[in-house]
């Protein structure tokens, strides 16, 4: 059907202006359809493959934290929401949070710098970082930049030992061993992805 446009230069206009307008407008229309519409579609959001990666990574993070039997699952879900700075994160991906570089609009959560100071308990966790505890990096989607960013926080199981002074001498070694084992498992799973 596109070739019929080029075959009829005198379509309802004068002979001097019709060939120019009819030959330039189909070319212009073709560029608009193929050139500007197609690149805009991927820029609107994440692709299916990227969303699947994020979902799988979220399930992986959720499963790796739930291997600790001493941390009750219901309190873990509440604690992750506090750390993420987003009060109603769905349970399918609790380790992800939305962050924005502008003042926080309602659907996106808090500014990344403010997320660590969400409440007093969270502030204590971030300031008590001993040399033996390793920070955990959880990726989060930043809608203003269109990329994945990382935020640092210490694993809840590791900091629990440091917050209770009476248990510090008893469980310091076992807590670090548990963390190192989970770190080795995490590296193995990342290599498979």
Curated annotation (Swiss-Prot):
Q: Which organism is it from?
A: Arabidopsis thaliana
Region of interest (Disordered), residue spans: 1-50, 85-104
Where does the motif SPL lie?
44-52
Where are the compositionally biased (Low complexity) regions? Answer: 14-26, 86-101
The organism's taxonomic lineage, starting at the top: Eukaryota, Viridiplantae, Streptophyta, Embryophyta, Tracheophyta
This protein's record includes keyword Transcription regulation: yes
Q: Which UniProt keywords apply?
A: Nucleus, Repressor, Transcription, Transcription regulation
Any one GO CC term of the record: nucleus
Q: Which domain of life is it from?
A: Eukaryota
Describe the disruption phenotype. No visible phenotype, due to the redundancy with SPEAR2/TIE4 and SPEAR4/TIE3.
Renumbered to this chain, motif EAR spans: 187-193
Task: Tell me the protein's name.
Answer: Protein SPEAR3
Any further remarks?
Answer: Knock down expression of SPEAR2/TIE4 and SPEAR4/TIE3 by RNAi in a SPEAR3/TIE1 null mutant produces lines displaying epinastic leaves.
Q: Its biological function?
A: Transcriptional regulator of leaf development. Acts as an adapter-like transcriptional repressor recruiting TPL/TPR corepressors to inhibit the CIN-like TCP transcription factors.
Q: List the disulfide bonds.
A: none
Please state the protein's primary subcellular location. nucleus
Q: Where in the cell is it found?
A: Nucleus
């Amino acid at each position: 059907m596109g070739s019929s446009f080029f075959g009829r230069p005198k379509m309802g206009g004068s002979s001097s202006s019709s060939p120019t307008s009819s030959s330039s407008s189909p070319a212009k229309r073709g560029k608009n359809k193929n050139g500007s519409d197609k690149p805009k579609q991927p820029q609107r959001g994440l692709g299916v493959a990227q969303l699947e990666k994020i979902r799988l990574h979220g399930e992986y993070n959720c499963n790796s934290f739930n291997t600790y039997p001493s941390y009750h699952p219901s309190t873990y879900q509440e604690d992750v929401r506090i750390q993420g700075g987003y009060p109603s994160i769905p349970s399918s991906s609790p380790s992800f949070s939305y962050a924005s570089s502008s003042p926080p609009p309602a659907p996106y959560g808090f500014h990344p710098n403010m997320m660590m100071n969400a409440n007093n308990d969270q502030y204590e966790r971030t300031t008590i970082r001993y040399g033996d505890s390793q920070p955990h990096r959880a990726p989060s989607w930043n809608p203003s930049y269109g990329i994945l960013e990382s935020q640092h926080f210490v694993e809840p199981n590791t900091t629990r030992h440091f917050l209770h002074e009476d248990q510090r001498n008893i469980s310091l070694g076992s807590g670090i061993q548990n963390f190192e084992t989970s770190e080795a498992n995490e590296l193995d799973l990342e290599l498979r992805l």
